[in-house]
Amino acid sequence: MRSSWDIRVTDTSLRDGSHHKRHQFTGEEVRAIVGALDHAGVPVIEVTHGDGLGGSSFNYGFSKVPEQELISIAVDTAKNAKIAFLMLPGLGIKDDIIVAQDNGASICRIATHCTEADVSIQHFGLARDRGLETVGFLMMAHSIAPEKLAKQARIMADAGCQCVYVVDSAGALVLEQVSDRVEALVQELGSDAQVGFHGHENLGLGVANSIAAVRAGAKQIDGSTRRFGAGAGNAPVEAFVGVCDKIGVKTGIDFFAIADAAEDVVRPAMPAECLLDRQALMMGYAGVYSSFLKHAERQAERYGVSSAELLVRAGKRKLVGGQEDQLIDIALELQRERL
């Protein structure tokens, strides 16, 4: 990390935003967004299908342009920013990591459910052997206690992960809950690995939670310009940078340039604004994986049921990423109850 940074920001608009865009990014959009973010000084830009390498499928939605092609475009466009990719073991495979690196990506971000860090061990080993920077995602971090989350972080760090993220996939964590988890990871990992935080806006706390994470010791923070992400979106990078400027935390990102990028480049690529509407609010309240939003809206329309109620029941069942197909079962259940 450069000495001019207190916090390294990763922009996930071109990965988490893919959920909101139903994975329909074009090469031209990726080129424009990467160029604008790079110009603003964003140090890391994540590019893949919303569900990571190999996510383009019937279950998750097909990409308009193959993700490896988009990674290559991003690498060719960025002058200073590093290009990162996300992969979920079992959805993506180890060969996908090799191809992404061959296309110029330099940061490998590996995500697992917060209780399943052990499935990432071989993938971290491969990434480190190939000289990639490594980041670990412990998703749905609200669903287990801080001390248990720290033990899972230790598994990732011992496998070669250089920064373990507390990932609030549902946007369900509230301030002190973020601080408690970040502090637990910082205490557990010490100098062995950094700690990061990835938030969502489903309770309107993306920026506030990110600042809480910074104050608790996080060194890497995710966000999406214009909140371009799943659910109500991620912590908006432009707002986070502005707050950091006001409290004296260095990000290396030009506030005015990132505000221009949000308004003039990212917004035109969005199908609509990411809103804190009823459905997104229910996800944060019930603790539902943020990428479920578009799937729930589709099944609610198909079966004539309430998408909000669908999401609340998904939360009660503690569904996790990869179980989107169970929304159909819940929709049918709701439909039967109405007969």
Swiss-Prot record:
InterPro entries for the chain: 2-IPM_HCS-like, 4OH_2_O-val_aldolase, Aldolase_TIM, DmpG_comm, DRE_TIM_HOA, PYR_CT
Binding site for substrate: 15-16, 169, 198, 289
CDD domains to which the protein is assigned, alphabetical: DRE_TIM_HOA
Domain Pyruvate carboxyltransferase, chain residue ranges per copy: 7-259
The keyword Lyase belongs to this UniProt entry's keyword annotation: yes
Gene Ontology biological process terms from the UniProt entry: catabolic process; L-leucine biosynthetic process
UniProt catalytic activity: (S)-4-hydroxy-2-oxopentanoate = acetaldehyde + pyruvate
Site residues, Transition state stabilizer: 15
EC number of this enzyme: 4.1.3.39
PANTHER family, sorted: 2-ISOPROPYLMALATE SYNTHASE 1, CHLOROPLASTIC-RELATED, HOMOCITRATE SYNTHASE-RELATED
Name used for this protein in its record: 4-hydroxy-2-oxovalerate aldolase 3
This protein's encoding gene: hsaF
